[in-house]
């Protein structure tokens, strides 16, 4: 068990001799930096290891940019207008952060290869009020898409009108595969930005929240030397150091990237039947009817369902009446407003496969009822 990886009789010193019970070590113990770097596909010198939540790091990055600016640029809070690009459907908690700071959010359509890069380039390269973009590049939330090599390279080669434009690269599902033989891979955005002469343009985030424990994992940020130095100026005021015992616990338990991957195979064995239960019902009951579309992801934590336009809220409401609680329709869009009222995020992780199949049966029944009502109303 992970909780037994360290105990009262353990040597509680990091590999460099740091006593993990003490204060200090702002950016994480060396072995934890190595573990997170390997997980994220980068190198330890790009890493700061924080506490348990990558969302906390993302919030801090936006907050810091808002109050103190990035690398000497004007703090966003002093500007008349700040905009963020939001690939949709996307992660509601990303959108909640930017909405909290009063940042204007712009929808960017997604495809199986990633965001519409023509739109991204048009906005980023020509509008200096565009300061960032939210990205879940691998097994995206909620669609399960992985950005293509071309998409990653186009991101790295952006020519932002704003010097302080940043890509918020939330690599939440970087090792969260569902299958051993069908796994998506993605280019390392850090090295691609370096090759393109844009080393400072990206903040990458990841955590072990869906690897070890949701509230007790470790989280990390990867970025350039200049960005890390800038962040540490504030971080040294904010904290004396994060939970090094938890960092040590994770390294002692997983040991290395191979240990992480082997552990995630066990997760996949639990998750895969749940996803397949939903997909089987969707394919059997809705396949070929033209009243919904979905994608079979190879990893991540969600299935994205697109109903007929104008039907999502009613489908979710009918499901709730019948005892199946879904994520609110519209949650996958900024401000909770899906322009087409069609996207529904399905999260299969919690119920058993049998419960999931039963819930999926009810879901497709509601889809059919609402769709028929919609068609008859025309």
Predicted regions and their residues:
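Short amphipathic alpha-helices in soluble, non-transmembrane regions
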Residues: 315-321, 359-364
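Conserved core segment of the aminotransferase class I/II
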Residues: 50, 191-272, 372
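Hydrophobic "anchor" residues on beta-strands that sit immediately upstream
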Residues: 132, 166, 203
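Conserved glycine-rich beta-strand-loop-beta hairpin in the small C-terminal domain of fold type I
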Residues: 265-279, 291-306
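N-terminal basic, amphipathic alpha-helical segments
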Residues: 1-12, 236, 242, 252-254, ...
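Conserved PLP-binding active-site segment of the aspartate aminotransferase-like
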Residues: 304-309, 326-366
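Conserved core of the PLP fold type I
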Residues: 10-163, 174-197, 312, 364-377
């Amino acid at each position: 068990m992970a909780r037994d990886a360290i105990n009262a009789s353990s040597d509680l010193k990091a590999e460099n001799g740091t006593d993990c019970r003490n204060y200090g070590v702002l950016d994480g113990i060396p072995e934890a930096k190595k573990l997170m770097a390997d997980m994220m596909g980068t190198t330890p010198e790009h890493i700061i290891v924080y506490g348990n939540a990558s969302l906390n790091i993302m919030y801090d990055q936006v907050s810091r940019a808002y109050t103190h600016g990035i690398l000497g640029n004007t703090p966003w809070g002093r500007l008349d207008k700040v905009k963020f690009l939001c690939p949709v459907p996307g992660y509601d908690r990303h959108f909640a952060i930017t909405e909290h700071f009063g940042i204007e959010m712009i929808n960017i359509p997604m495809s199986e290869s990633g965001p519409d890069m023509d739109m991204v380039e048009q906005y980023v390269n020509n509008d200096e009020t565009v300061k960032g973009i939210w990205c879940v590049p691998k097994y995206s939330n909620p669609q399960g898409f992985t950005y293509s090599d071309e998409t990653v390279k186009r991101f790295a080669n952006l020519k932002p009108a704003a010097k302080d434009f940043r890509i918020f690269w939330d690599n939440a599902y970087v090792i969260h595969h569902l299958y051993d033989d069908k796994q998506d891979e993605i280019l390392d955005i850090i090295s691609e930005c370096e090759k393109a002469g844009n080393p400072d343009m990206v903040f990458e985030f990841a955590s072990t929240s869906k690897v070890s424990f949701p509230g007790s994992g470790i989280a990390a940020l990867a970025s350039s030397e200049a960005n890390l130095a800038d962040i540490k100026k504030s971080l040294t005021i904010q904290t004396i150091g994060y939970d090094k015992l938890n960092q040590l616990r994770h390294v002692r338990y997983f040991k290395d990237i191979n240990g992480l991957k082997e552990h995630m195979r066990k997760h996949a064995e639990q998750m895969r039947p749940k996803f397949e239960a939903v997909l089987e019902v969707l394919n059997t009951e809705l396949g070929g009817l033209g009243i919904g579309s979905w994608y079979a992801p190879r990893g991540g934590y969600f299935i994205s369902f697109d109903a007929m336009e104008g039907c999502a809220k009613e489908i979710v409401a009918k499901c709730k009446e019948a005892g199946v609680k879904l994520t609110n329709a519209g949650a996958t869009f900024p401000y909770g407003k899906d322009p087409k009222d069609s996207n529904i995020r399905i999260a299969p992780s919690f119920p058993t496969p049998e419960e999931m199949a039963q819930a999926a049966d009810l879901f497709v029944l509601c889809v059919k009822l609402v769709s028929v009502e919609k068609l008859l109303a025309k």
